Amino acid sequence: MPPPLLPKRSKLETEKAQSNKITPREEQQSEKIGKSNHAASSSSSSTQGAVKRRSVFEDVTNASHSQCVQSKEDNIELKSHVSKRTKKGVGEVTQKKIKSSKMGHVTSLSNMEKEFILDIPNKPKTLTTEEPSVFQKTLVLNEEPATKETCLMRKTLKSCAFHQETLLMEKPLTLLVETEDYNEFDTELMTSKKKDKPEDPTIIEEMTDLKKSVIRKVTLTSSPLWLKNKHVVQEEKPVIQEKSSFKRISLVSNVVTTKEKPPVKKPHFRKKKPTTEMKSLLQEPSLEEKYNTQEDASILKKPQVLQENTNNKDATLTEPVTFKGKHSANEATHTKKPSSSKNNPDPQGKGTNLRPLRVHPVTYENEPMSSKKSTTKKKDSHFHGPSVLPDKHSPQMEVSTVKKSLALPNPTTEEKMLHFPVATVLEKQHNMGEAPCLKKPSPLRKQQQLPKRRRFFSNSAVQETVIRKPLFFKMSTTEKDPPSQWPSALPKKHISPGELSKQKKQHVSPKHNMEEDSQCWLDSAFKKQLSREEPASTHTPLKLEMQQAITKETGFHLRNPLVLPTVTSEAKSLTKEPPSFREQNTSLLKRKSTTHTITLQQAQSEWQEMTDEDRNLFSIKPGSHRKEPIPEFLQNPLPPNENCLISQKLSHSMPFASQKTTSQERAHRKESVASNDDKNFFSQDLFSPFSSADEDTLKFHKSLDFQEQVDRKNDSHKKMFDSQDSVSEEESFLRKLFCKDRCSSTEELSQERTVALEQEFLLIKILNENTSSDVDEPLSHQSPHIQNHSDTTKEALEASEALEAPEALETLEALVASEDLEEPLNILEELSTENMVALMKMLVTEDESTKDSFSGNYTAAREAHAEKSLSLEETSINEAATLKESLSSQEKHRAELVTVLKELLVLMKNPSLKRVALAFQENPSNNVETLLREVLALVENSTADESTLQEKPSTKTDVTPKELLALEENSSNKKANPMDSLSFDHKPDTEMGEIARMVLTDEEYNIDTLYERVLALSQGLIAADQLSFTDLQNFEETKIVDEEEFFKSFLVFENKNSPNMSSNAFESRTDNSSAIMPSSKAFNPVENSNPYVSSSKSFKSTLGAKETEITIQDDSDSLERIEKEGQDPLLNTIYAKDVFNYLKEREEKFLVQKYMDGQMELTSDMRAILVDWLVEIQGSFQMTHETLYLAVKIMDLYLMKAQCKKNHLQLLGSTTYMIAAKFEESYPPSLSEFLFICEDMYEKSDMVSLESSILQTLNFDINIPTAYNFLRRYASCIHASMKTLTLSRFICEMTLQEYEYIEERPSKLAAASFILALYMRNLSNCVPTLEYFTGYKMAELHILVRKLNHLLNFRSHSILKNVFEKYSEETYFEVAKIPPLSKQDLENLLNCALFH
């Protein structure tokens, strides 16, 4: 069917005639006008036609209902115009007809298809009147209309405004599918515009399809044939994508689009004036970003094609020249700068721009800046011209410009000079535009890791880096160092994988390119490290790019970009960059700075704040990267330990694990020492591309194993420092090993070359010897251990004197027997851990009977181990075997120690009162105070780090807190060990004073090892993961403190409550075996006293709470807060009974009767919905439960006495909540907030008047007892755990929504809820106590208990889920997920309670 005509057909036809009459002079004039002014791009007749076309397009885009059917004659006329143009030739005739074709902006589906075909071939051929011939010939026309296209772009964009663009966008979607030339697209649009009048309706249909086809663009762009034109296609894509956005911003974009018309051909000229438009565009980054991301998707689909286009730089450059026709020469010059000046943050454009390393770094955002600076320049004007669609045109232009810029690096340097001053202007805009782009591209990167993805990823990365770049440029502008910052700009630009590919193609010193790329990736990745999406994506593109244009060696080198803090020769220039980065992002940028020298120093200074200098020795370079990775390696420390061999290559997926990267860096450095062939070029970075892949990889794995373990085993180094008797050799060795990181690259090479083999040999020895030092320290330098082996016997004797537990002896003997079967590497480890266990048990049991026997066994074991370790030292087993054996032994002895620690926990959880009393007596308060002071001195510097350690326990984290303890001094562990020994020695009675002194002198290393081992093992336990390094040092110390507090509180409680012991909770405290009390509550007094007795000490938060978690059992995790706050005189249990007796009397006054029958418009379901909403409000405002219960009670009391309309029910709920909040809350929400939660449906006067009415109805007596008050009372009486209390609250709160429970007394409802909670928690033995304190017998409660259990069983059928969801959260112990009792089980329990 012939498509309907657009409205005002006659006008359109006249416009066609007028446009056909246009002369070449007019075209030239219009072009000139377009250059100078986008407002007037054609003659008066053309402007009129443009206006008419705009109206037509508006009608079309808006899907105006007035659409006429166009006759076939119109189609014939259009075809004739096309044929005439083709016959006249590619020159003036085509241009004239194209101008005349302004009239027909809308193309039919067939026309669009033909246009697509036209776009494909760029050969100049004549079009036939027939559509098929047009289809073929139009393909030929693409090259012909070079100048035509410019005019077309001008006129079409101007005339079409964004409406035509919408149409064009619709068309371009298909065009994009078949052709990817913006120029072709424009020419076809011109021709199709003539033809399209009859086919407008179909075009409208295609618009919808085209919108859909935005997705198609990706598939369409996949065709590599149009790579050269691809940039045009990309521009078209943005046009399509921006259609929706343009509809919104059609007015502004229309102004610019008129100037956009020639952006491909004459964009350079027309952008002079639209600088303001550029600003507007930049201010409209959402448009750019939207279609950018879409284009990126398409680009990802067609990534190879895009890369090929970039490869065909010359062809693309020539094509833009041909397409642009007259302006081709100008563009050549312009594109040189435009490549840099591509402000358009199109990810693709950026990718292309990024690829020219030298041109792109500054040019990308700098030229936009320069363009803004000097809009007079064509280049600037061009960018301003496309700025309307900066993303549309920029990618294409950028491709060509980048290519040209590659060919013309000199102007890029000039551009750089321009960029620095201008950078400040555009940086903000680009940052704004790019930020969203970054958000979108990151997921795209994840989704697509194709080689094109590099481009896209690099674009996204570049966008991120570009965001930083403008900052850098700002810095540079302020610093006025543009010339010196050019290389720095390159690293800051972080030449994306796209640049990498270009560099590869350019073959410009591929090593430098790789290094630069890796640095760029490093910087970008580091900057992106905050967003964890990018690390993986960055690594993958690096791998892809490296595979393409780089050897596997270099590829691997890039795989460890994080390890590469520096880039060979460019590291110096990079060193210049980091200052700017630091100024921009301070510590983060410092960490991210890729410079080797600066990062070493700065990273050390920063990392010293977080770790030991020993650790700095290992991670000097990665130190810069480590600050960021710290949280992540804490999170994922275990995998590195286990996968030290494998993950190191793969660690790039987790580049932020600083220790991994550091170990890898060290390994690379060591490899560089071993393999000197490839290191010459990477000497500064100490990164070898691994010339001998096999040998180097083996060495690399070994070194990685060593050094990762060393990272995790800083304790060995610490021990080395601790045992200063033998440290001299170890220090020299370690410094030789790790001073390389601090030394300059050249010095490092020389030193490493000389020492490489020796270091590897020493590392092997150290690995074999020192696996015993710590569970996580196979690499611990064993020279101190070996030298101290002679002293180990003495240390064993001293330790045996200190260890007085018979359990310790038994366990030690058993462990030693098992250890004899294992290799000597495991013996010292297990012995050390056993010694710690023995110390802990001795401290708990305090039994001195087995001192001699234990000492003998311990000494023998230590001697045997010393001999075996010496023999090991001579034999020096292979590193891999040693590591495997050490791992297996660690696992075995870890499992054994787990059982031992569990036994200790059991002992500590259930100490007899006598033993506690003895411990308290043996440990005078003076010793405790001294210990606490020492502990505080140790803990003050590591509290935050320990908290993170506890949250994320792992083998690495075990080492980390230790190192964190030694922030200020390298030998902090050495000092900590004496303090630890003091704490252990003070804990036993005075008899241990001498032993303590001996331990200070000789046993420092031994205790250190024990502590470290127990620390490593303790975190494998669920309950014991609270045993941090300091906790282990002060384990018994905390125990004693708790015991001391226990006795104080116990005596106080007993004195205060002796007269009322039967009526308060402390009756159970006097008798640990009381039947009233749960069996697990025996140690509750410590829990009760601990929170507030030690609250004045900072020791509480770090150690006291941990001790509580260890000693308290399942049902006594913590008590009710009110009971913990027993010091409050208002909550004193002496008055508790009288207070609640008063409340029980008072509740009689506020009993609610069923009132729903008296309500005209309300139902029980409405009430349930309202209460459910109130529960949600309580959680949103974080108000107390008392407020919620009181609000519901006030509402029921009011509705019992007054009528309420349906439309005022929400107002009633909000008002009652406000009244309750004023009564219960310390800081109640304001009236406006309560109106806001009602969505401002009511006026302030309405709520005030209703509040007055409610208070008057209740006689202003709102101190109403609620079930929640009684629940708290009952929980305090029976010492229920918070979990049990929370479960009872959940049961009781479920009744708030149920209308049938409003008649129940609050005290009775609370009692039934609590009894059901006890049954559900298997605490039926507490029911008699509850009956006593509540005053209700089971005979009175069993019916209500059954109803409540039925309610819980059928809660899943309820539509109202707020209560259930609330108590399903972890903050409420997920009590809602506890399965309710079956009917039969409940009956059995109730029968037992009733008849026994």
Swiss-Prot record:
Protein keywords: Cell cycle, Cell division, Cyclin, Meiosis, Nucleus, Phosphoprotein, Ubl conjugation
Keyword Cell cycle (UniProt): yes
Coiled coil, from the record: none
Gene Ontology cellular component list: nucleus
Chain intervals with Polar residues compositional bias: 306-315, 780-790
Motif D-box: chain residues: 54-62
Family the entry assigns: Belongs to the cyclin family. Cyclin AB subfamily.
Protein name: G2/mitotic-specific cyclin-B3
Gene transcribed to yield this protein: Ccnb3
